[in-house]
Amino acid sequence: MPAQAPRLWLSPLAAPSGVGLSPHEEQWCAALPAALQPRYRATRQQLRARLAALFDVPPATIPLHSPPSQPPRLEQGWGFVSISHSGEQLLLAWSPWAVGVDLERRDRVLQADLLAERFFPAQESQALLALPGEERRLAVLRSWVRKEAAIKWMGSSIAQDLRHWCWDATRQELSHLQQGLKPPSRCLESAGWFCGLVGEGAATVQWGEHH
């Protein structure tokens, strides 16, 4: 097991990895619509390459189970992984503990008022709507990446749980209003991207090489 701190890697989706897919991954990739195959191939190749470097083992030996449209999993004892992509950028995470990540462009144009009112808990949306326009847009984005990361961390869905997650910027606390969960979370900024991370050890996360 590598160092006991979560790792993040941010890179272009098309970055060369020099790594192949497993036989199962090749089959899953071939079954996808042609338009989706390059993204699936690139994400799994990069994930294998990052993990191989982290564990110092050949990429083909990484015990990764990663069918399309399912959260990627490692065998017990190898830790946990999470994937997020936005446009042509890819965010990967590894952690000794359950982890979720999300990625959004810092300059993404969005209807911050509408998002806050429709999808955020009342107490959070009220605080957000009191902010000036650009500050509000950035605050909504920072909250959003934490919440999407939290949904991946708990293995849930946006439709089921987005409105139950609340980010208290004053307390710096992310909480699930129904289940009482309060996982550690971070919103990091790198090269014009907001990177949300949720899970144990978030405070000690380290960027991997060449992020």
Describe each region flagged by the PLM.
Residues 1-211:
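Conserved nucleotide-ligand handling architecture
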